[in-house]
Amino acid sequence: MTYWTLGVLAVGLGADAFSMALGIGMEGVRRRDAFMLGLVVALFHIFMPWFGILAGSALGLVVGRLASFIGAAVLFFLGGRMIYHAWKEKREGPAFPVSVPRRRGNGSGGGAIVGAGAIVGGRLFAPTRWELVVIGAAVSMDALSVGFSLGTVGAQLLPTVLTFGVVAGIMTVAGCRIGQQVSRMLGATAQLAGGLILLGIGIKLLLGSASPG
């Protein structure tokens, strides 16, 4: 496998993480949480294909499809929650005034990347450690399946998984930052758009798991 092919594959695997981070950035996320999310996604994009490459492609079809259903369920939950929040705020009004002050942090790396959730609803995406793990796993399921496939073609283990991890981590943080900028322009509608993005990724996972071969 050439480095060019490896890079393209890494970007493709990171696309789901980027899209999900875009939706999260629209809702609003602290810089610290954005970087933590990027780190967790990077680690999953290292260890899941690592396991897949070592295990080979013998169980790739079965495990890959089961993983896709799990990932789709998680993304449906996250997307549905964001859409519900957007609908509730449009119906009842924002929980705080639109001019709510932006959080600047306290010098400990906790400054906020403010998105629609913070500007309109007064909320920030503030995941627990467990939620970070679940989210990171949900967008890394394809990496497991790809690992099984790469195990049959003798792909170099360390360069492959490190490339996957670094690219996915960067794309995740970038998605949060871009989502921030989009939310400033779209306001409350950004939460709805972010939820639809997550639902779209979930549908993609389901369609992929249902396709033959």
UniProtKB/Swiss-Prot annotation:
Membrane topology summary: Multi-pass membrane protein
Keywords: Cell membrane, Ion transport, Manganese, Membrane, Transmembrane, Transmembrane helix, Transport
Cell membrane keyword on record: yes
Disulphide bond pairs: none
Keyword set includes RNA-binding: no
Signal peptide positions on this chain: none
InterPro entries according to UniProt: Mntp/YtaF (IPR003810), Put_MntP (IPR022929)
Pfam families on file: Mntp (PF02659)
Location(s), subcellular: Cell membrane
Transmembrane intervals: 6-26, 34-54, 58-78, 107-127, 132-152, 153-173, 192-212
A GO term from the CC aspect: plasma membrane
GO MF, any single term: manganese ion transmembrane transporter activity
Family, as annotated: Belongs to the MntP (TC 9.B.29) family.
Stored HAMAP family: MntP_pump (MF_01521)
Function of the protein: Probably functions as a manganese efflux pump.
UniProt-recorded name of the protein: Putative manganese efflux pump MntP
Natural source organism: Heliobacterium modesticaldum (strain ATCC 51547 / Ice1)
Lineage per the UniProt record: Bacteria, Bacillati, Bacillota, Clostridia, Eubacteriales
Primary gene name: mntP
